Amino acid sequence: MASETPRVDPTEISNVNAPVFRIIAQIKSQPTESQLILQSPTISSKNGSEVEMITLNNIRVSMNKTFEIDSWYEFVCRNNDDGELGFLILDAVLCKFKENEDLSLNGVVALQRLCKKYPEIY
């Protein structure tokens, strides 16, 4: 299952061979009910040891749902079939944290890298 829906780095979305993939990202805005703007962590192209946030635009949503702005989700996505930029979100799971807990950006990047190297990791 994990190899069929790989967890990907946001910089590699346009090169994903799988029709369905997963990405961990933070909601920045929801301009319309069917559109999102996300930010997802990756390794900086300028400095290979720092984490930077990549903004992802032109994202369509297949479900009628209002997302929590600034919250983290894991998304199950499908690449556009028509050659346009962006992708379609098929499902989303909110990453809930206990009080005073937050997401580790370095941890997300490490998970993305491990999943690329070992696709059987779910």
UniProtKB/Swiss-Prot annotation:
Q: What modifications follow translation?
A: The N-terminus is blocked.
InterPro entries this protein is in? Rfa2, Rfp3_Saccharomycetes
> Which keywords does this chain's UniProt record carry?
DNA replication, Nucleus
Q: Does the keyword Transcription regulation apply?
A: no
This protein's GO cellular component annotations are:
chromosome, telomeric region; condensed nuclear chromosome; DNA replication factor A complex
Provide the assembly information: Component of the heterotrimeric canonical replication protein A complex (RPA).
Q: Please, what other remarks does the record include? A: Present with 4280 molecules/cell in log phase SD medium.
Q: Which family does it belong to?
A: Belongs to the replication factor A protein 3 family.
Record protein name field: Replication factor A protein 3
Mind giving the lineage of the organism this protein is from?
Answer: Eukaryota, Fungi, Dikarya, Ascomycota, Saccharomycotina
